[in-house]
């Protein structure tokens, strides 16, 4: 099946363990949220544990192995993972044949994939012992020169030579022992069309490009970047270990300032990275690193310098400083990479090398196939031998800048000849494996993922795909495409739909649960409630959808808490937390959403007078101002990330949804050995509410969204232990409570979520000083949170005096005094 109601991953990173089929009644929901048919008949699928919809746990054999594609051509590993793919075996064999053929050619003529991806050492400008070499692939050019500041933009004495493969080259000797082209000087590639016209273009492999900020719509110039040793940034810190599960902070450096201007790499490193680390994220995903001439394109339209950092925020050395600073804080750094298309620009884009030649002599396809109608951009010819340009691009970012992996943008457009345009994928496998599948692009992605993991085995590659392509997140050794994770893109769409179109009473607990668990359990997903997409002008963030204009007038703790703000803060916490806890094996949040930033992004453009006023998304003063309620959402974000850090929620393969009670508006599930209780009812408080669990024993509160530290009312007692009672007849699951062999009772206030952990009494009795403390979950979140009391928690009369007398004093946080015990598979 393309989707299941649970997700689990083999502990073996390479191969899925052998599994037994189970019978399960499914409600079908396709991966990108389109409304499709459903089926109620029983179907045989594979899964490790039940979902709460009467599935049965199965045994696994983690010792199973699978031969590589080179060892056994007939054994297509992915078919052993999903037998439903068997009818498409010929497609996978063809894919494998193409992949192996391409790889063999690369090994035969280039010495292997890693050597093939060293194009930046041959092409573009490279410093040699006694001069500078420059090479450019431009087979359609009739003549070529190199021009720049160094020769007064006169290339008459620097004509280049062309070889049989269309590569132009020149050696520029040193002058008096110094490079003929000074560091940081402007350069361009000048060539003549077949019709005799000369044009100037930015070199395709240039490492840096700048624009004159004093000239409106000035063209970009390539820059020869070769700083002296004293000016080169030297990395000081090693890459941190790859996290068990990524908690990703998606960020745009340029708009990270509180001021209406473009922020710099160094300012981001010094001012923003510590905030990210403080909120317990372990990964930063940087947008808009690749140079793009039009700022408002949000970096999607990459121009010529695919190898160049965006000069708006600083130099290459500044970006290296940022990444090294992130590594020193224990943060992995991923880069948004655009290999799905390129800007249509001619003067400063790779498109400027296309002068009507065939696709064999171009980076792009010719004709309609080389043009994306919706994006107004050019499409790469991935079968061209010059795919080394893109593969080298990946190696360059990994080795020169020490990135730890990539988020590949627009993968859906790459996978299909129709690019996903006007397609509503229903989950029918015929939609994924047909003549519409672009096998050239699939093979390129397989090579790309192989390369990245060959260079950096602990790299993280994430695919942005809305189609739900089966095998996207399976290893290349199984004839999968090789990504480590895929984005769970249907989740934010569902939340936005609920917030825009449904009353609280209309929220379906089963639909929410299905949407969050609707993924291929053998392929890891990164879940998110919102990303940069929801922050762009014309859309709204979750916080703004919940609280709208009241965010501008009712967020002060010095005023009474309005119903809108109370509901908004409560649901903001719940939506993000259940997305993390149930939605995938990784989690992502966009800059500012951790504290409910109210504004949207509006890049400078003609329609707003080229203003940067709305292009400074993160107004940090909102969360730094202690009497504003934004601090509560930020504190909870910090705490839920820390909870995952302690209990490995995202990395756990045990995920069981035991109850989706639509009447009560309550969802109960287990992840690892934690029990989660989400009460989405806007009014009802449930006392003695019975929840099922796996293991017997004593349970305590690990995290409580209603705690005062998080802007709640503090209604859930944290000192009382909850003891389980056995349910049903041992060994007969259908006699249990919600298919769980044990249960305990809790207090569940409206619009709250509470997490319970099982106490290991042996460790408790030993008073082990090395045990982590759940207290830290609250203490870390409470830092600078409770200085100004929220007057809505007390009577109006008592608050007036308290605010006046104690507004500058810290108050007790009431932090939990609970030790954390590691139990089960955690």
From Swiss-Prot:
Please verify whether the record's keywords include Transmembrane helix.
no
Question: What reaction gets catalysed by this protein?
Answer: Transfers a segment of a (1->4)-alpha-D-glucan chain to a primary hydroxy group in a similar glucan chain
Q: What does this protein do?
A: Catalyzes the formation of the alpha-1,6-glucosidic linkages in starch by scission of a 1,4-alpha-linked oligosaccharide from growing alpha-1,4-glucan chains and the subsequent attachment of the oligosaccharide to the alpha-1,6 position. May preferentially transfer long chains during branching.
A single GO cellular-component term on record: chloroplast
Cited InterPro entries: A-amylase/branching_C (IPR006048), Branching_enzy (IPR037439), Glyco_hydro_13_cat_dom (IPR006047), Glyco_hydro_13_N (IPR004193), Glyco_hydro_b (IPR013780), Glycoside_hydrolase_SF (IPR017853), Ig-like_fold (IPR013783), Ig_E-set (IPR014756)
Record EC number:
2.4.1.18
What is the name of the protein in this document? 1,4-alpha-glucan-branching enzyme 1, chloroplastic/amyloplastic
Complex formation = Monomer.
* Localization per record: Plastid, Chloroplast; Plastid, Amyloplast
**UniProt pathway:** Glycan biosynthesis; starch biosynthesis
């Amino acid at each position: 099946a393309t989707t299941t109601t649970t997700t689990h991953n083999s502990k073996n990173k390479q191969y899925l363990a052998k599994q037994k089929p189970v019978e399960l009644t499914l409600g079908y929901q396709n991966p990108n949220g389109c409304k499709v048919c459903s089926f109620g008949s029983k179907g045989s699928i594979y899964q490790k544990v039940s979902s709460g919809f009467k599935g049965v746990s199965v045994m696994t054999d983690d010792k199973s192995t699978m031969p590589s594609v080179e060892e056994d051509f007939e054994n297509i590993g992915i078919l052993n993972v999903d037998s439903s793919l068997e009818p498409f075996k010929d497609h996978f064999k063809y894919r494998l044949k193409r992949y192996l053929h391409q790889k063999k050619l690369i090994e035969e003529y280039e010495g292997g994939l890693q050597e093939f991806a060293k194009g930046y050492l041959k092409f573009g400008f490279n410093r040699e012992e006694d001069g500078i070499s420059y090479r450019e692939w431009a087979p359609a050019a009739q003549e070529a020169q190199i021009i720049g500041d160094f020769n007064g933009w006169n290339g008459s004495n620097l004509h280049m030579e062309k070889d049989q493969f269309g590569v132009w080259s020149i050696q520029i000797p040193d002058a008096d022992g110094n490079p003929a082209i000074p560091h940081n000087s402007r350069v361009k590639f000048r060539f003549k069309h077949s019709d005799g016209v000369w044009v100037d273009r930015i070199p395709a492999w240039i490492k840096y490009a700048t624009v004159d900020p004093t000239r409106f719509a000035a063209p970009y110039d390539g820059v020869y970047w070769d700083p002296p040793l004293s000016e080169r940034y030297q990395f000081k810190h090693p890459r941190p270990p790859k996290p068990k599960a990524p908690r990703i902070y998606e960020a745009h450096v340029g708009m990270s300032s509180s001021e209406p201007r473009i922020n710099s790499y160094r300012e981001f490193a010094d001012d923003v990275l510590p905030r990210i680390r403080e909120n317990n994220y372990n990964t930063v995903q940087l947008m808009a690193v690749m140079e793009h001439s039009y700022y408002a394109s949000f970096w999607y339209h990459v121009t010529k310098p695919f190898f160049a950092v965006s000069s708006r925020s600083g130099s290459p050395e500044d970006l290296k400083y940022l990444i090294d600073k992130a590594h020193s804080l224990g943060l992995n750094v991923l880069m948004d990479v655009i290999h799905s298309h390129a800007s249509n620009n001619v003067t400063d884009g790779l498109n400027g090398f296309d002068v009507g030649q065939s696709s064999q002599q171009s980076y792009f396809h010719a004709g309609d196939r080389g043009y994306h109608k919706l994006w107004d951009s050019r499409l790469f010819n991935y079968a061209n031998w010059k795919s080394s340009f893109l593969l080298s691009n990946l190696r360059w970012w990994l080795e020169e800048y020490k990135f730890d992996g990539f988020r590949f943008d627009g993968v859906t457009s790459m996978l299909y000849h129709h690019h996903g345009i006007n397609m509503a994928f229903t989950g029918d496998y015929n939609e994924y494996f047909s003549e519409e599948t672009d096998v050239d692009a699939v093979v390129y992605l397989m090579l790309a993922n192989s390369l990245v993991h060959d260079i950096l085995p602990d790299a993280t590659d994430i695919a942005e795909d809305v189609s739900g392509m089966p095998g996207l997140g399976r290893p290349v050794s199984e004839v999968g495409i090789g990504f480590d994770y895929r984005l769970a893109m249907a989740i934010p769409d569902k939340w936005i739909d609920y917030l825009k179109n449904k009353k609280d009473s209309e929220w379906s607990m089963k639909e929410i649960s299905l949407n969050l668990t609707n993924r291929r359990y053998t392929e890891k997903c990164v879940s998110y409630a919102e990303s940069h997409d929801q922050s762009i002008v014309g859309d709204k963030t979750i916080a703004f959808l919940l609280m709208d204009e009241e965010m501008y007038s009712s967020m002060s703790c010095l005023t009474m808490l309005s119903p809108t703000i109370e509901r908004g803060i409560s649901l903001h916490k719940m939506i993000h937390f259940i997305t993390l806890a149930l939605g995938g094996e990784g989690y992502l949040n966009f800059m500012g959403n951790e504290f409910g930033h109210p504004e949207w992004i509006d890049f400078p453009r003609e329609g707003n007078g080229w203003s940067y006023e709305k292009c400074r998304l993160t107004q940090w003063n909102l969360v730094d101002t202690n009497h504003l309620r934004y601090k509560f959402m930020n504190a909870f974000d910090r705490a839920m990330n820390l909870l995952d850090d302690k209990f490995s929620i995202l990395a756990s393969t045990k995920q069981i949804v035991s109850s989706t009670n639509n009447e009560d508006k309550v969802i109960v599930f287990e992840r690892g050995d934690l029990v989660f209780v989400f009460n989405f009812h806007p009014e009802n408080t449930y006392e003695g509410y019975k929840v099922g669990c796996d293991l017997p024993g004593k349970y305590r509160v690990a995290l409580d969204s209603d705690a005062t530290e998080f802007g709640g009312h503090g209604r859930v007692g944290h000192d009382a232990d909850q003891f389980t009672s056995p349910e049903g007849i041992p060994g007969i699951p259908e006699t249990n409570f919600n298919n769980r062999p044990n249960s305990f009772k809790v207090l569940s206030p409206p619009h709250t979520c509470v997490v319970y952990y099982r106490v290991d009494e042996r460790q408790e009795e030993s008073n082990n000083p090395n045990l982590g403390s759940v207290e830290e979950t609250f203490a870390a979140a409470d830092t600078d949170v409770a200085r100004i009391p929220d007057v809505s928690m007390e009577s109006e009369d008592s608050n007036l005096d308290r605010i006046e007398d104690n507004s500058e004093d810290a108050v007790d946080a009431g932090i939990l005094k609970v030790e954390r015990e590691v139990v089960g598979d955690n």
